[in-house]
Amino acid sequence: MLKRWLRPFRFQRPVGAVEASSRPSASPSERPAVELADASAILNLFNRCADVKHHTYTLNAREERSTVLFVFCEGMSDSQHMIHEVVLPRLHRFYECYGFTDAGMLQTASQLQLERLPDDDWQRKATQLVFEGKLLMYIPALRLICSVDIAKLPARKPEESNVEVSVRGAKDCFVEELAINAALIRKRLKSPSLAYEQMALGERTQTRIGLMYMYDIADPKVIQEVKQRLQKITIDGVFSATELEEMIEPTWALFPLMAYTGRPDFAVNCLTNGRFVLLVDGTPAALIGPANLLLLIKTPEDIHFTALSSTFGQLLRLLGLFVSLMLPAFWLCLLSYHQDQLPFYLLATLTVNRLGIPLSAGLEMFLALIFLEMLREAGVHLPSAIGSTLTIVGGLILGDAAIRSGILSPGIVIVGAITHVFGASLTNQALGGTVSVLRIILYIFSCIFGLYGFFLGVFLLLVLLASLQSFGVPYLAPMSPPFFRDLPHALFRLPLAWKRKRPKMLHPIDDTNQGEQSK
């Protein structure tokens, strides 16, 4: 009766369900890693890449199941040595003993460090691994795609930096390889407290980014904020550390909110103070944060000289910052609007020197500043021998010719030369570029409003500096807001015996400078 009553409600079994249900269920180790992949699908991923090579090998000529497909990128891997002397011999031994029957056994007994590709996103992972120098291995008998590390990426050896010249410090500097840069820091900081995390940014470039910090020193809130900003980045590619800095810091700041160095010894010094370091694959430098204005004044050589000489050099660089920024605008105010503030003999000399010059003082200063900026730009981008020759010869000859021809007065040329020399004391290139732009802005204010415009521009500049923060750390710290414990160490290079505390403005977990977790 029950069967007769349920007969009208019977459901038809879908087509193919009988065959699927009759198949024996595979164990987790026997299930194919990539069910939709085959040799043609893999090769189609790289059909437009001439540098990607593929070879098919047969481990046993009498068995069709012994076929293996190798795919690798020529020039980024040690294919000749690793494939023929390491990978193939071990696969031969494994196949003779076990055959291609179990993917799990292949991973454990083949003596190869195999990385199995995910089931759902094997195309993206396969392209990423091949262009990282890995060997992609496809076994049709197991429907398995895995990779073996045979990478040998183009890289150069660490050498002395051309920008941050070392006098007494270390000669090795960062290179374009991320692993080497991390090793240069790890070599100097042999502590398990040094945390190192990697991630990939860029939908197309998949640029590797390394984040390093001391987990028992650095402020956890700062590290968490850095990770969140990195995770929010969605872009096709990251090509330099400067682009990464622009994506994680506001672009309207004008001033660099992260320090930039090519010296691993300086990076290690910042890590032990509670800062973090960002390494970008392909960039021979590191980003350091949080950064403040006084950190950008320091140089890596400060820790390699005595306290007295380093303090004197740091004060000179601080003086160079203010002079190169404000001298042209201030001199223009005195020369154009407030001649009564100049000494009489100096005013008489300047007046005599300006006889016959057809240009106003403001236009003279503008031409001098533009001329010096062009010399600096040419000296930076030309080869070192040609750049130094052009800067010296061009400055001397053109400056003397401008005075003799009556285009520029000697006073304007001297002010421009002093500005250029004092600005050259700033070793941070990003800060130097910012000073050049702000110098022109102050010049415009002074040219229009005189001394009132000069002080207005300085006031607006101070307001901007006071409003900036780098990952929660005020840009003018420890001066504003005042951290009296940190102020002497920020302005001067005090003896090491006096430095028993880490900078309070960085909010370190372990604030003492006497070992791990010292109290």
Where are these regions (language model features)?
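Membrane-embedded alpha-helical signal segments
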Residues: 1-326, 344, 465-519
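Generic detector of multi-pass transmembrane helix bundles and their immediately adjacent loops
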Residues: 324, 330-333, 343-519
